[in-house]
């Protein structure tokens, strides 16, 4: 009997599958016999329970399982035979009684949508360009110097000097203080500490704290009012004004290492000294520039593709993607050490928009790759792996690491595929080159 497929919408379909209950007779008998071997009933040895008792307790369950599996198998055979582009999991609903001679199931399912590609030549994207010069290298080296900063007490002579004649706390200094805060003259929880350390100007403390400590010398104290922000994490004091008193215990000035061959060696530059260090810093900055520019262009191209293409997104695919995002969120919580993260009640609805966008873009890319033959080639994958491996100390080991794991290879394949899509899109769209500084590039999301 020919199977009819009913069109319920742009991607929604329905079909009815029928088969004779007798077709399952042998499977049913074997399944019940298997259940009977492990069934435990008082008064009977294992495997000796009468068939009638097995039938009475498990007959309906076995019928349903076998009938559902049979209908599911028939449906997937139908999809393969008819070339149905199934999207997501089908929903099977029994249409007949378990004991009926002819078993029938209604199957509701979705198909992959038609993707209508827009006019890519009408789109405009920005491709940023950034040059790394001596100033950018100097700033990067300053960051590396700050990572090796150490502090000396102001006014005390040492190998690196005494920090100057002014012994008062200045921006950039590390101060150690005792403080106590009171609300209506009464100390409150969390409002008192001894030997509390912070660096002036880093913005780690509330502005009033920094302003009070600035200019004080060791042994000096200062009182000041502090109004906690309304959204302060401590709810007992949020929005309230407390009176704080601080006493400075020590003021320490920052000493950063001199940029010399010894400093270069401390960064792992064994030969070539400062010149080689600057060369490596530039290479790292160039890689970072390339990564950020590629990421920004990719993000804009994907947004333009999303806007230019028309399609109806199958709900089943969105639901599956939401579930994946929920599991990913739980995994993230587990890695952070959050208790009971595995069963955290995370509602899938909060990921609805993100999941829809992901599925939509995935369908667009799939269609574009198929139509324009943009799939990643073996040579492209190899070239990408070798390029990434070249930045490591042992490139051959990194190459082996990638090829030893199919999941890692798949990640590289997807990376190359996305690059192919970007190249195809930008070959058709209007690309506007825009030169910006490294600092400006760093601020772009």
Swiss-Prot record:
It is found in: Cytoplasm. One of its GO terms (molecular function) is peptidyl-prolyl cis-trans isomerase activity. It holds the Pfam family Trigger_N. It catalyses: [protein]-peptidylproline (omega=180) = [protein]-peptidylproline (omega=0). This is Trigger factor. Its main location: cytoplasm. Involved in protein export. Acts as a chaperone by maintaining the newly synthesized protein in an open conformation. Functions as a peptidyl-prolyl cis-trans isomerase. It comes from Polynucleobacter asymbioticus (strain DSM 18221 / CIP 109841 / QLW-P1DMWA-1) (Polynucleobacter necessarius subsp. asymbioticus).
């Amino acid at each position: 009997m020919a199977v009819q497929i009913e069109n319920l919408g742009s991607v929604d379909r329905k079909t009815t599958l029928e088969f004779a209950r007798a077709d399952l007779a042998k499977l049913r008998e074997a399944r019940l016999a298997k259940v009977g071997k492990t069934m435990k009933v008082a008064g009977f040895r294992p495997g000796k329970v009468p068939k009638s008792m097995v039938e009475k307790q498990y007959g309906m369950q076995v019928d349903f399982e076998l009938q559902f599996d049979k209908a599911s198998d028939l449906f997937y055979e139908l999809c393969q035979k008819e070339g149905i582009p199934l999207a997501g999991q089908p929903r099977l609903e029994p249409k007949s009684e378990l004991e009926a001679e002819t078993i029938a199931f209604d199957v509701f399912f979705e198909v992959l949508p038609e993707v209508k590609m827009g006019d890519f030549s009408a789109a405009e994207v920005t491709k940023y360009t950034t040059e790394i010069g001596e100033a950018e290298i100097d700033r990067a080296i300053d960051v590396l110097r700050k990572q090796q900063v150490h502090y000396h007490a102001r006014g005390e002579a040492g190998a690196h000097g005494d920090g100057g004649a002014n012994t008062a706390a200045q921006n950039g200094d590390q101060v150690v203080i005792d403080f106590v805060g009171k609300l209506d003259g009464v100390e409150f929880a969390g409002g008192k500490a001894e030997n509390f350390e912070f660096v002036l100007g880093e913005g780690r403390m509330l502005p009033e704290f920094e302003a009070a400590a600035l200019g004080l010398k060791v042994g000096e104290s200062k009182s000041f009012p502090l109004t906690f922000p309304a959204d302060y994490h401590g709810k007992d004091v949020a929005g309230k004004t407390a009176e704080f008193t601080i006493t400075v215990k020590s003021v320490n000035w920052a000493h950063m290492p001199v940029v010399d061959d010894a400093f270069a060696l401390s960064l792992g530059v064994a030969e070539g000294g400062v010149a080689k260090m600057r060369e490596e810093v530039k290479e790292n900055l160039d890689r970072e520039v390339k990564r950020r520019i590629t990421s920004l262009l990719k993000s804009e191209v994907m947004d333009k593709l999303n806007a230019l293409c028309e399609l109806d997104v199958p709900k089943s695919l969105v639901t599956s993607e939401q579930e994946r995002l929920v599991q990913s969120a739980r995994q993230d919580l587990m890695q952070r050490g959050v208790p009971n993260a595995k069963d955290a009640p995370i509602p899938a609805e909060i990921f609805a928009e993100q999941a829809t966008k992901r599925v939509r873009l995935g369908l667009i890319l799939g269609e574009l790759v198929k139509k324009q033959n943009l799939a990643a080639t073996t040579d492209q994958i190899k070239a990408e792996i070798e390029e990434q491996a070249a930045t490591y100390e042992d490139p051959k080991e990194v190459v082996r690491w990638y090829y030893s794991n199919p999941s890692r290879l798949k990640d590289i394949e997807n990376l190359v595929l996305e690059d192919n899509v970007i190249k195809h899109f930008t070959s058709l769209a209007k690309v506007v080159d825009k030169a910006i500084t490294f600092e400006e590039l760093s601020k772009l999301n």
